[in-house]
């Protein structure tokens, strides 16, 4: 998996290497209106040419419409047939997250986000237009993840040689009932939880538990919090 907004991926030496690999390439590109916000990066139209070059050489090209803002809805919709013509496999869409509070936003965890009643109709329209042109649609927005053609939103779904980690809170909260791997059940596999629990003595507790056990504990103790995070409280 390669994710970029740069032009280096189509330099011959790197393009040849990607062509020899079982590789999905993601390119971040929303629309031309974002060009002034990203000085030093290729403008949208150049990225479209980059995508077209990549599409014939790699397993899949995924366009990341991230971060999405409702103000560019018409631009995004108008570009979907162009993405299909360029050989794109699918798009992943996620709403903009703001650090500071803004009027009309809702606070989700540490972010200020667009409310679902704003994002949902946009996502539904974008999804329908993608399908009309033969593109896959993925929702990078946690609260709308289940809208996607796969809840593994990076674009690797069904591709030989790739297997996503389905045992995550997003899957569990959306009723997918994924099974943990045997390794996840082994004691001492929950190290990633140390970053979520930075309190004295927590390392000893985590080291004596499994990833699976800590996931169940996390879900059971913060159910209302995660319902809000994954848009299931409305």
Report each predicted region and the residues it spans.
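C-terminal accessory extensions appended to soluble enzyme cores
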Residues: 103-234
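Conserved AdoMet/S-adenosylmethionine-binding subsite of the radical SAM
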Residues: 1-122, 129
């Amino acid at each position: 998996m390669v994710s970029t907004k740069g032009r280096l991926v189509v330099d011959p030496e790197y393009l040849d290497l990607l062509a020899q690999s079982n590789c999905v390439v993601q390119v971040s590109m929303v629309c031309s209106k974002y060009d002034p916000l990203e000085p030093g990066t290729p403008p949208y139209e150049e990225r479209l040419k980059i995508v077209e070059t990549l599409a014939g050489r790699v397993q899949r090209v995924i366009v990341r419409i991230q971060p999405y803002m409702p103000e560019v809805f018409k631009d995004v919709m108008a570009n979907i047939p162009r993405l299909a013509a360029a050989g794109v496999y699918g798009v992943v869409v996620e709403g903009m997250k703001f650090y500071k509070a803004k009027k009309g936003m809702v606070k989700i965890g540490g972010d200020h986000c667009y409310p679902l009643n704003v994002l949902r109709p946009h996502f539904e329209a974008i999804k329908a237009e993608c399908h009309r042109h033969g593109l896959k649609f993925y929702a990078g927005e946690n609260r709308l993840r289940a809208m996607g053609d796969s809840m593994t939103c990076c674009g690797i779904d069904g591709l030989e040689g790739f297997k996503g980690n389905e045992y995550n809170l997003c899957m569990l909260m959306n009723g997918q009932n994924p099974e943990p791997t045997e390794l996840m059940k082994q004691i001492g596999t929950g190290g990633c939880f140390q970053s979520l629990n930075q309190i004295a003595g927590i390392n000893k507790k985590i080291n004596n538990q499994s990833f699976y056990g800590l996931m169940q504990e996390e879900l059971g103790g913060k159910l209302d919090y995660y319902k809000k995070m994954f848009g299931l409280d409305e």
